């Protein structure tokens, strides 16, 4: 999904050459129905390809936001044969996700995501129905719900303490060298994910298909990094489904090879843990819970465990890295947060119990979610039945995309949205409702299951990091705010100089 038009634009020439006899069919596929009385404004495009050529910069969320300034918060574009309604307003997006949920609840997946998710065999990609309800109930009961979070409290504390110890050691080894924040944070988040999902921090595993043991780094690459990159692969046939018979071997080879590696590694990890269970070594983890339920096929079991494994490995890292970048860039705001921590905690280390009493910390977290939306675009959905959004008629069969980046950069809803200003969220104690102002965790019945854990980890980590160290950007990094294509990942990993505060 991420490189929405690198591959799409690259395949346009091939598609155009092949569609000569299909122009009429394409026109019919995108023609608005006659009874559509008040459609959203349409962004002008070209025959056959629609607006694909205008999205070639690979950051469609930014292009969508620019179009919103011209056409308004809701408008229609065409991506090949598909008509897509784009929402760029918090108010309209919440109307779609909450009030009109029953009309707009079917996931629209690219061919790459269809393969990687084993045709929606995950909570995040499944349509609303029995499987989605079951999967969400399982992960909330055993891993991400309030009660389950209490069971993993010690593990969350451990990974934050590990990060702080690593920071102290790196500063001690070379006080003048900047450290790479992402490397340290990534390793500890993956440790947490493995303990929660598999019951232990796996250092290596034997994979039958590879004929050898693979390291933890290789496990991470096969289950997280490679999958994230493969998920953004675009098959030009997604835009021209009437040409699905045309081969695209290079795309298919990349996607199926990546999926096969992920499956081989996940099967090896699950096999290793099943052997542990046979030895009588039961543990509190997601895999043990799912096996005890005994309601899933082997494929469903593998996919749900994999989903749990990557749960904390992406958005929590993105948000925390951006928060520390902004605090290092803005020493006055960093000092305000530090003083708040001192007033509330004194010399005591910040804990999760302190979080409700740290309103400026909450403001830092919320403003980071707004300014640097971890998921700039919510994956497309189908409109199941004729409906109305923001006073416009939207017919069944239309695709809908919510541009969270555009919602949070909407000048009519946010003052000076390009500025990172935690003060816009400051005031009073932290409230659970604050988590949904930016819609970073979604809204309505499809709200992100991991929102509570993400908040616990990110807020506690940010507070401890500022409590222990003064943060300063590497010289020249003040304006490095570019992201990796569609994701919110910093294109340039955060390099910082740390100064121990001598608290402990």
From Swiss-Prot:
The keyword Metal-binding applies. Pfam families: p450. Belongs to the cytochrome P450 family. The lineage of its organism: Eukaryota, Viridiplantae, Streptophyta, Embryophyta, Tracheophyta. The chain crosses the membrane at residues 3-23. It is found in: Membrane. GO terms for molecular function: ent-kaurene oxidase activity; heme binding; iron ion binding; oxidoreductase activity, acting on paired donors, with incorporation or reduction of molecular oxygen, NAD(P)H as one donor, and incorporation of one atom of oxygen. It comes from Oryza sativa subsp. japonica (Rice). May hydroxylate diterpenes. This is Ent-kaurene oxidase-like 3. The gene is CYP701A19. Its main location: membrane. Its EC number is 1.14.13.-.
């Amino acid at each position: 999904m991420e490189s929405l038009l690198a591959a799409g634009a690259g395949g346009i020439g091939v598609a155009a050459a092949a569609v000569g006899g299909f122009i009429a069919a394409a026109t019919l596929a995108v023609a608005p129905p006659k009874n559509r009385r008040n459609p959203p404004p349409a962004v002008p495009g070209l025959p056959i390809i629609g607006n694909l050529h205008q999205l070639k910069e690979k950051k469609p969320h930014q292009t969508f936001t620019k179009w919103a300034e011209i056409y308004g918060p809701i408008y229609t574009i065409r991506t090949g044969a598909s008509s897509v309604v784009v929402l760029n307003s918090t108010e309209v997006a919440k109307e779609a996700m909450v009030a009109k949920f029953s009309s707009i609840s079917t996931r629209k997946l690219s061919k790459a995501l269809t393969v990687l998710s084993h045709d929606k065999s995950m909570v995040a990609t499944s349509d609303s129905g029995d499987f989605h309800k079951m999967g969400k109930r399982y992960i909330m009961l055993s891993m991400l719900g309030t009660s389950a979070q209490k069971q993993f409290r010690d593990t969350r504390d451990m990974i934050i303490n590990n990060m702080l110890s690593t920071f102290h050691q790196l500063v001690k080894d070379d006080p003048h060298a900047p450290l790479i924040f992402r490397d340290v944070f990534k390793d500890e988040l993956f440790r947490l994910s493995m303990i929660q999902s598999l019951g232990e921090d796996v250092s290596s595993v034997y994979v039958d298909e590879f004929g050898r043991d693979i390291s933890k780094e290789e496990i991470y690459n096969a289950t997280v990094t490679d999958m994230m990159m493969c998920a953004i692969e675009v098959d030009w046939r997604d835009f021209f489904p009437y040409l699905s018979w045309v081969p695209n071997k290079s795309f298919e080879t990349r996607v199926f090879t990546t999926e096969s590696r992920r499956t081989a590694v996940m099967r090896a990890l699950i096999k290793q843990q099943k052997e542990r269970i046979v030895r009588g070594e039961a543990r509190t983890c997601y895999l043990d819970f799912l096996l005890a339920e005994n309601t899933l096929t082997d494929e469903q079991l593998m996919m749900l465990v994999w989903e749990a494994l990557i749960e904390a490995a992406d958005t929590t890292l993105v948000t925390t890295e951006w928060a520390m970048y902004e605090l290092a860039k803005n020493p006055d705001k960093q000092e305000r947060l530090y003083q708040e921590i001192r007033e509330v905690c004194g010399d005591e280390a910040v804990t999760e119990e302190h979080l409700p009493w740290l309103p400026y910390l909450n403001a830092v977290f919320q403003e980071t979610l707004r300014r640097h939306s971890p998921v700039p675009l919510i994956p497309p959905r189908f409109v199941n039945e004729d409906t109305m959004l923001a006073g416009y008629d939207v017919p069944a069969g239309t695709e809908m995309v919510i541009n969270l980046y555009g919602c949070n950069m909407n000048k009519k809803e946010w003052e000076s949205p390009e500025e990172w200003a935690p003060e816009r969220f400051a005031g009073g104690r932290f409230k659970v409702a604050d988590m949904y102002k930016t819609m970073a965790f979604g809204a309505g019945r499809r709200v992100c299951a991991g929102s509570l854990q993400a908040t616990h980890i990110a807020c506690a980590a940010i507070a401890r990091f500022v409590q222990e160290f003064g943060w300063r950007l590497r010289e020249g990094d003040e304006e490095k705010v570019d992201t990796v294509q569609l994701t919110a990942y910093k294109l340039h990993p955060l390099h910082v100089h740390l100064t121990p505060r001598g608290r402990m």
